[in-house]
């Protein structure tokens, strides 16, 4: 079991290296932002959505890669893990709106948190930077897509076709009551959501020790 754990750990490290060797395209002139988007781009090109009626078995995140298919939450799970392996703080969690739960990935860049929708290929910008959580809560952002879109600016959001204005309004409403940056920062990284930090052996040991002493 320990051998398998370390084997998966080095698999993720190598995968990150391979992604950046393979993906030589530029999606943004800022390198930090470009790397965040390149990982999402790689996922969209290599992992397909699960179709209705398919059996889903998820022993660990590498299962997703081997199967090359994933549910929306599994996209976010794997994406947040790969971001952590690329030295970003990241987690994912479900956000409820109108009795529907939507998974999103959160990643910290330059001391602020931004939100990515890796399953649908959406990211949110303000000026020439990724929009902060507070920008999105205040409806001060634009939507960009890693998918090719048509001239009518229609997007697929969890299997529903919506135009840009409707989608922007919906994203704002989903996050309007969500945590601010300070609230996210105040939470221990192991308690923010997902399992992005628990694939690394050192982090896993720290997590288990903190659990034993009821610190988290």
PLM features: residue spans?
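Aromatic-acidic/polar surface patches that form glycan- and anion
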Residues: 32, 68, 72, 164
